[in-house]
Amino acid sequence: MDSAPQQQPPVEFETDPSRYRHWQVSFDGPIARLKMAVDPAGGLRPGYELKLNSYDLGVDIELADVVRRLRFEHPEVRVVVLSSGTDNVFCAGANIHMLGMSTHAWKVNFCKFTNETRCEMEDATAFSDQIYIAAANGTCAGGGYELALACKEIYLQDDGNSAVSLPEVPLLGVLPGTGGLTRLVDKRKVRRDRADVFSTTAEGMRGKRAKDWNLVDGVFARSKFEQEVMKRAQAIAAAPIKLLPGERRGVTLGPITPELAAHARLYRHVELSWDREARTAQILVRGPSAADVAVVTAGDEAIHAAGDQLWALRAFRELDDALLQLRTNHLDIGLVLLRTEGDPAQVLAHDAALAASREHWFVNEVLRHMARVLRRLDLTSRSFFALGDVVGNGMPAFAGCLLELALAADRFYLLDEPAVQVGLSALNEGALPMSHGLSRLAARLYGEPDKFEALVGQRGLMDAEAADDAGLVTVRLDGIDWADDTRMAIEERSSLSPDALTGMEANLRFVGHENETSKIFARLTAWQNWIFIRPNATGPEGALSLYGKPQRPHFDWNRV
């Protein structure tokens, strides 16, 4: 079992600006300056230095926090200028020595998290009117160029030395792991033959050629670089756009600070617990209370005043942290049981009020955040079974936004009792899309369009039989069969190969068309993960293993 990261102190994903070691953020009206100034001694794990603005998971945890806080705490920002605080280098990408000494699981989780952060930058540009500009004031290599590719525009310093490059294939025997190849051809629309040349040219490309090949949007001489980049940023910030309504007063994201128990993390609205012997975990999400519903039904100003304590924001921040904990600190957990608790009617009332206010900038950010957390669940390599049964005195609350958990799960078991109900809201109809753009309801009923059309616009609660007939339930069980049938399903799932299940689930969850984002996770990431375990990369004589050493790699020349 690949469990080395668990022998280290557990990774915590919560941070705040007072704890940043690697990023500097400043503000000038609608323009934010985000400088990457990585502390070489600030690695998350011992054994490597973060030289040349290279990054590890700790650097990216801070970046993810910056991106999210810009959206919630600084809605006045229209442009984010991303540059380097280190002379002559923008970013050297992921730290190669960190990758070389890491387990396969650590590399995979690291790349997945960095991919999600880059996607969140693009999401901010698309839906929060925060345009990211990369000001590559130095060498921009590998993951550094991939970071720039996540920005809407890229500007390169023309000084005879600064270049953009993706040297992973020629130097390391791996792929650019953070979306580079996909964004090169799908986003920047670089011709694929030119992309082939670029991706096998270790030194990359500079100046006019980089601009001619559309690898960057412009090149400026060193003497004018800062001036020209800021001129462009000011032009974007001044461009007239139709902003969402609502006074642009930021909402501070305070800590969520779970209570830690021996086998659990207890949040206000979420509980994560685990059983290592059974290799299972449970995530319980409690629905909104009557008081929570009263807040959202009071309108835009009341929702904004609730700030980070708004149920929809707080609960999904807690769920996000729980998912990241499972991914990184609990590698031996293979099956996650998703449960909800509360009043499904209150969830529907909550969703209706939130949907009615969705044109307010803060509500838009809350909904976008909910969507990103649910996509994190979709992309998590664990089996998920949603269990809609009565636990203690609590009723299941799989309705509206919490029904998304059941629709995201690989299976949904529902207890057939009169008091158990599920329901749909406007949020199930595209407000919380998957990474490839479909709603989970549309993905669930992709092969049954008549059932899908019948559910569109349907509101209110339905009993277990009606939900089953509508195609929302995998298995409907009565009280007599529930305990035995779910126990056997859980035991069977836990006995199967985790590798095979990861591949199977990734193929079955994302029906329908692909887009740039889904290609990054389904194609680029899958190939990268395979290459990571091949001897040509990570064997004793592989290119990644020997990077920085005097020996040359020895390849197995057989194509697979």
Residue ranges, per PLM feature:
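C-terminal alpha-helix plus adjacent terminal tail
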Residues: 1-61, 65-78, 84-92, 98, ...
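Conserved hydrophobic packing residues within short motifs/helices of P-loop NTPase cores
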Residues: 80-81, 133
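Hydrophobic, small-residue-rich alpha-helical packing segments that form membrane-like cores
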Residues: 93, 98-105, 109, 113-131, ...
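Proline/glycine-anchored alpha-helix kink/cap motifs
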Residues: 125, 372-375, 442
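CoA-thioester-processing core
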Residues: 141-196, 393, 399-454
